[in-house]
Amino acid sequence: MTQTGTKSAPARVLLIEDEPAVMALVRAVLESHGYNVVPTESGAEALRLLEKNDFHGVVSDMRTPGGVDGAQVYAWIAQHRPELARRLVFITGDIANEETAATLRRTGAPCVEKPFRVHDFITVVEQTMGRAA
């Protein structure tokens, strides 16, 4: 049924974003490109979802409510699901912040700066996670 025989369902992507408008846009873009999106507004909830579910990739805002930010989500993934750490994309409107810059240097994870062009965002996602379909 699939070309490669390795995919039977759309790639599940965990989306961590607390701004409703950005969440809606990113979710719509990912879904229109064939990804199955599981959204959450907080880093703490993201960790609960990661503990109980498998994901093909993660798109995470750097700053999230719930006491757990994007850097902490990445650290958990790197420790517990290292294969997933290579498929995480950060999004942030605070790229000039030194803490954000240090996290990006330390992790090597790609980051798309908000506001972003949809084409630029999905290009980074597909380069990082592969195409969904």
What are these regions (language model features)?
Residues 1-14, 78-79, 83-84, 101-102, ...:
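Non-catalytic signal-transmission and effector/linker regions of two-component phosphorelay proteins
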Residues 17:
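Conserved acidic carboxylate
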Residues 23, 65-67, 96:
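The feature encodes the CheY-like receiver
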Residues 24-32:
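Charged docking surfaces used in two-component/phosphorelay signaling
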Residues 48, 69-84:
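Short amphipathic alpha-helix used as the core "switch/output" element in two-component signaling
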Residues 91-92:
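Hydrophobic/aromatic residues positioned on beta-strands within the core alpha/beta folds
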